Regions:
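ATP-binding/phosphotransfer module of carbohydrate and carboxylate kinases, centering on a glycine-rich
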Residues: 1-59, 70-72, 95-99, 117-122, ...
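A cytosolic small-molecule/anion-sensing beta-strand core signal
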Residues: 20, 64, 141-142
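Short hydrophobic alpha-helix segments
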Residues: 29-31, 79, 149
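Adenylate-forming
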Residues: 46, 110-116, 139, 158-161
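A charged helix-plus-loop insertion that forms the helical arch/lid used to bind
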Residues: 73-86
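Active-site neighborhood for divalent-cation/phosphate handling
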Residues: 90-126
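Active-site glycine-centered loops adjacent to acidic/histidine catalytic or metal-binding residues
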Residues: 106, 132, 293
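Glycine-rich phosphate-binding loop of actin/hexokinase-like ATP-binding domains
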Residues: 121-175
Length: 303
């Protein structure tokens, strides 16, 4: 049985797992991620301590934030680790550890997990929206992940929704990250003290009227973005992931917001009955990036 060491690099923690070719996790763990002020040398020192635990592995697969040239194995635009920008990472790993290595963007890795074994495995065309610090994900067309010529496909956060205020964070889809929902709850409830996502959903799930109004405004904005992507690509299914997607009430409200688009605009484009996107949650949550990174490795080296 082949064994692979798979990494999910994040800003807070660096997760890793020993996995087989069917994505079964044999063992996993995590360490605190190196900081932005660390160096390439100190970064690799952390990786060394993990790789040393697993002699005889058949490859290394990596999921990482940033705009990633997955063909050349280079992080073109760094998401977390500035000292890794433009380095030939897969070459460095292969030379250092003696095994084949692949790297993929974290949002695209999560999309690949859904294509391989998740809630997009039964469709040819789909979209994944990951709600985290901002909005990332991936686009799947004809069963294949669409990366784009600059590897920028699926970076929804950069979509501008208010050109009149280009320097404002509220002008971009990035506002629909978890912090955007929290800010809406705080605003609608007129809270002075900062709350976190868990507290926001405590108010929402308790049925607090203003918190529910905030959630509806949030899902209305998210629905418009999902609808716009669907008008462009006409996908069979859109799935949402990220921590807050595990809250059932989010999907319930999002589905209603999508229906409301047609209700509020019955004469849109002369009454054309535009198809509404089918939405669901991702199957995988915490392990999605690991599973997708492994799939990318297997596809690259065993296609």
């Amino acid at each position: 049985m082949s064994r692979y060491l798979v990494f999910d690099w994040g800003g807070t923690f660096m997760k890793y797992a020993l996995m087989d070719e069917k994505a079964n996790i044999v063992e996993k763990g995590k360490v605190v991620s190196p900081g932005k002020k660390d160096t390439e040398e100190s970064f690799f020192a952390v990786i060394d301590t993990i790789v040393e635990k697993y002699p005889g592995i058949d490859g290394i697969a990596i999921s990482s934030p940033g705009i990633i040239d997955s063909t050349e194995g280079i992080i073109d635009v760094v998401g977390v680790f500035p000292y890794l920008q433009k380095l030939p990472l897969t070459q460095l790993f292969e030379k250092r550890y003696g095994v084949r290595t692949s790297i993929e963007n974290d949002g695209k890795a999560a999309a690949l997990a859904e294509v391989w074994k998740g809630n997009l495995s039964d469709v040819k065309d789909g979209a994944v929206f990951l709600i985290g610090t901002s909005i990332g994900g991936g686009i799947v067309l004809d069963g294949k992940l669409r990366r784009g010529k600059d590897f920028f496909a699926g970076e929804y956060s950069s979509m501008c929704v208010n050109i009149a205020q280009p320097s404002s964070a509220s002008s971009y889809v990035a506002q629909l990250g978890t912090s955007g929902l929290i800010e809406k709850v705080m605003g609608y409830m007129e809270l002075d003290e900062k709350i976190d996502g868990e507290q926001a959903f405590a108010f929402i799930n308790a049925g607090e009227p203003n918190a529910l109004k905030a959630l509806k405004k949030y899902t209305d904005d998210l629905a418009i973005t999902i609808f716009s992507i669907n008008v462009l690509l006409d996908v069979e299914k859109t799935v949402i992931g990220g921590g807050i997607s595990q809250q059932p009430i989010l999907l319930k409200y999002l589905k209603q917001s999508i229906q409301d688009i047609r209700t509020y605009h019955p004469d849109f484009l002369g009454g054309i009955n535009l198809p509404l996107p089918e939405v669901d949650t991702c199957r995988f949550y915490n392990d999605a990036n690991l599973i997708g990174a492994l799939y990318h490795f297997l596809y690259e080296y065993h296609k």
